[in-house]
Amino acid sequence: MVGTAIASFFGMLAISTIYGLAHTFIAKSLSEKISQAWAHRSARFMILVIIAIQGISAFILYGSSLYLLYQGATFTPYTSDYGTLYDGSEDITVAWIVFGLSMAVSVVADIIKVILVLTFAD
């Protein structure tokens, strides 16, 4: 399971990198509107609150995902009394689910931020 956990880690890293590059491209194309929206105090406050929520939740969920990958990689396989083999793949699957939830929170937060920027831009 160590190989699967390492491959999953690099897969998660690649997905995060691709999302970060797309985010950078969108931010550059909206830079003028972001500057206009930043002039409004209420927009600035709402955007900062969303950024804080996004950062805290992403940190917790991504950290949980990495911990689950670690658990799956270091799991000692065993067979139950009913013949089912437990090998740690459940932890790796749950890690992917938690990572997907983390990415979903980031996407929703970024969509809300874009809506706020476009609403408050002059």
Model-derived segments and their meaning:
Residues 49-66:
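Hydrophobic alpha-helical membrane-insertion segments
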Residues 8-31:
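N-terminal signal-anchor/start-transfer transmembrane helix
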Residues 1-7:
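Membrane-helix interface and helix-disruption motif detector
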Residues 2, 34, 65-97:
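Interfacial non-cytosolic loop connecting adjacent transmembrane helices
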